[in-house]
Structure formats: structure tokens, C-alpha cells
């Protein structure tokens, strides 16, 4: 079980890190190619790309939730993910209110709040599994994760060199 969980973590990071980097750097062109026509203006593209970028920061944690939650279910523990999800729901509502309305980030604030809430809930589930000796912090510092970061950096530098992207 522990080996399967470790492999799942490595796979999540291997997929999430390059996706995160790519989506952040290409947020505007992606939004423009999908929606920039008709009533959707350049201003809308820029504002929508902010939301995409802030959701991207939560991408690894959204993906980790798909690994962490079934890890509890497979051990017949449905209460822990339930209580963490309930906490995350309230935290998400509070953070969305703070970022969207009090700090004035608008729709991008909703993305920030959602990303921070999923970060908190995935960290809680991760540390509960760590306490049960099913995970260790060493999985975060695995060489696969560094390879994903390095390959993402190479990808960005190659696009920057060949396409001339402003960074």
C-alpha cells in the first residue's frame, strides 16, 4: 500500500509540475485561443488568464486530493476525509470572501481562495497519513520531482528562445 501511494505521489508531481509551469506561462494565449471572439474582449482574456494562473497554483494539490482521499477510503476511514472536506468547504468560503470582496481581487480572488483551501486540505490529509507512517516527507524531495522541475525549466527556456515569449 505504501509503495503504491509513493508511486502515485511521484506520478502526480511528474504530471502536475510541468502542467503548472506550462499553464501559467501560456495562460493568456490559451484563453485567447479558446474564447477571444465575439463579445469576449482582450480585457476579458487578460482577466480570465489571471483566474487560470491562480487556479494553476492549486493544480498539484487538486491532483493530490485524488490520491489522498482514496488512500483513506481504502483503509475504511471515511470520517477523516469528510471532516477535512468540511473544513476545506468553510475555509474556501471564508478565503473566497476575503480575497474576492475584502481585498478586491474579484474573480481571481475566488481562484486564490480555492487554491489555498485545497492546499490546506491536502496538507492536512498528507500529515495524517504521515502520522500513520504511510507517507514520509522524502516523497516530496524525490528525484522524479526535481526531474519534472528541471524539464519544465528546459521547456520554458526552449519556448522562450524559439518563440520569443516575454517572461
Task: Please give the residue ranges for each predicted region.
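Membrane-embedded alpha-helical bundles of multi-pass transporters/translocases
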Residues: 1-167
